[in-house]
Regions:
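Short glycine-rich His-centered loop
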Residues: 2-32
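Short, solvent-exposed turn/loop segments enriched in Gly/Ser/Thr/Pro and often Arg
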Residues: 61-63
């Protein structure tokens, strides 16, 4: 059963996979604010199927963020929005920089720092919201021995552990991607194994909605019963 009460505020935060061309100048939950990815699809389905709930969806994803960059703006981007629920998907850039960053001398995020920072954010947020939703970072790479995929799995496991400690709903996006990749190539979903196209975003949105109890049989008239 969908847990979100009427007029709930749901903030989504993360990196470019959450951001996806959102208009930073738009008012929260206004035109252009949702981006072109899974957040927009979640918003559209919740609005169409649960019009009686009048849910406010806010996209606070920022392209390029790792967990430290996201944490630096947490108060402004998340807590100041007074959310009832917070959904987080972070980690792919924390991993990716280990592979594309050495010649740029970027500041890398270790697994321990990732866990410590994630734990701090969830610990600060849990008492102020009705619910937390933690989404796994993911990579559209079926070979689990691929070095980057293997590291993504380790960071995703940390995210799962943090979610468990804080009673958060855990959305295993990687598992959904792995199931798809048993049937089709990663190039159906992404050109770089990390940034989904619209098909990939639909898979992310569907996985998120299933995890939170979206009723796929509900009609737009059920609120009249």
């Amino acid at each position: 059963m969908l847990p979100f009460e009427k007029n709930s505020r749901i903030v989504f935060c993360g990196d470019s996979v959450t951001d996806v061309n959102r208009d930073y100048t738009a008012v929260p939950a206004g035109w252009g604010s949702f981006g072109d990815g899974y957040v927009n699809l979640v918003h559209a389905l919740l609005t169409a199927v649960y019009p009686d709930r009048e849910l406010m969806i806010m996209n606070e994803g920022v392209g390029g963020d790792d967990i430290k960059l996201m944490a630096a703006r947490w108060d402004r981007d998340v807590l100041d929005m007074k959310p009832d629920y917070v959904s987080v998907m972070i980690g792919i850039n924390d991993v990716w920089r280990h592979f594309d960053g050495p010649f740029r001398q970027v500041d890398l995020v270790s697994l321990d720092e990732f866990e410590h920072t994630y734990e701090d954010l969830m610990g600060r947020t849990e008492p102020r919201v009705k619910g937390l939703i933690v989404m796994s970072p993911f990579m559209m790479e079926p070979n689990r021995d691929d070095p980057m995929r293997a590291m993504v799995d380790r960071y995703a496991e940390v995210a799962r552990q943090v979610a468990d400690r804080h009673g958060a709903t855990y959305v295993d996006v990687q598992a959904a991607m792995d199931h798809f990749l048993k049937k089709q190539s990663s190039y159906i979903l992404s050109m770089d194994r990390c940034h989904p196209g619209i098909e990939g975003h639909m898979l992310v949105a569907r996985t998120w909605l299933q995890a939170v109890g979206f009723d796929w049989e509900r009609t737009t008239f059920d609120d009249e019963k």
